[in-house]
């Protein structure tokens, strides 16, 4: 039988969620609800102001995601990044094309978390965050973008982001799970 029925509230716009945010996380097409929930929990615990999810990302309100998040999905502001065509239909190509531009227009430096040759280290990103405002490399508002399990971020996202950042690895390990890497990045950029 049914335990309860609930009405889902309408999601706010990206601009509303990011209005007073200084640090946001973006989940690009993360489909494993365990990872969605873990990222939400880490974001809440490590002072991320908001979480944005792309249209193909798993639902943070899905039962497994909500359980893994330990309920923090109901505490941290979040919304889906969506855009609409002139006729009112959803624009399936809004992310990453106009979506990244929207974040930039809101004053965010967009950071693709990816293992690329041109990536800077997480330590360098942290230095830029804490640099004096007059330093030309200073970052004021930060949008950390995390990619799906296996494939990572799309090449379109990496190409459009302001910076690409990697977490240095040891012992021949090539990468971390998205939930682990997000926690490391959230902690380092506090």
Stretch-by-stretch model annotation:
Residues 2-4, 42-46, 57-74, 155-190:
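Structured adenosyl-cofactor binding patch, chiefly the S-adenosyl-L-methionine
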Residues 6-118:
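RNA substrate-binding interface of SAM-dependent RNA methyltransferases
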Residues 12-13, 121-123, 177:
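Secondary-structure junction/capping motif
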Residues 101, 107, 126-129, 133, ...:
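Generic low-complexity, intrinsically disordered sequence content enriched
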Residues 111-173:
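Active-site/ligand-binding-proximal alpha/beta "capping" segment
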